[in-house]
Swiss-Prot record:
It is linked to Amelogenesis imperfecta, hypomaturation type, 2A4: A defect of enamel formation. The disorder involves both primary and secondary dentitions. The teeth have a shiny agar jelly appearance and the enamel is softer than normal. Brown pigment is present in middle layers of enamel. It comes from Homo sapiens (Human). May promote nucleation of hydroxyapatite. Highly expressed in placenta. The keyword Secreted applies. GO terms for cellular component: extracellular region. This is Odontogenesis associated phosphoprotein. It is found in: Secreted. It holds the Pfam family ODAPH. Keywords: Amelogenesis imperfecta, Secreted, Signal. Residues 1-23 form the signal peptide. GO terms for biological process: positive regulation of biomineral tissue development; positive regulation of enamel mineralization. InterPro entries: ODAPH.
Amino acid sequence: MARRHCFSYWLLVCWLVVTVAEGQEEVFTPPGDSQNNADATDCQIFTLTPPPAPRSPVTRAQPITKTPRCPFHFFPRRPRIHFRFPNRPFVPSRCNHRFPFQPFYWPHRYLTYRYFPRRRLQRGSSSEES
């Protein structure tokens, strides 16, 4: 069996560790000899900004933005016509599949004209006679 060519996750993990380790070496340092020689005025940018104004809590009722679901999400279906063929078991389409349904066979000869009745033509009863 041929071995599949799949991407090695160990290679991905090693590459990720090396990339992160290289990125840690290139951390931005402010201009100067070391990081500890920052002036006291550098922090004033953040301390002089005023805090955001406090808002009063919203206690009123919120409007409902969801549309209500229609309880009738299905339409009634038309009754189906099952065509019954000779020597074939009749299995209704909407049977309970958990119940062991025993299919039964329709008789040969009485199949067609009893379930699909036709009009019998009477001789001499044409509408063209006068």
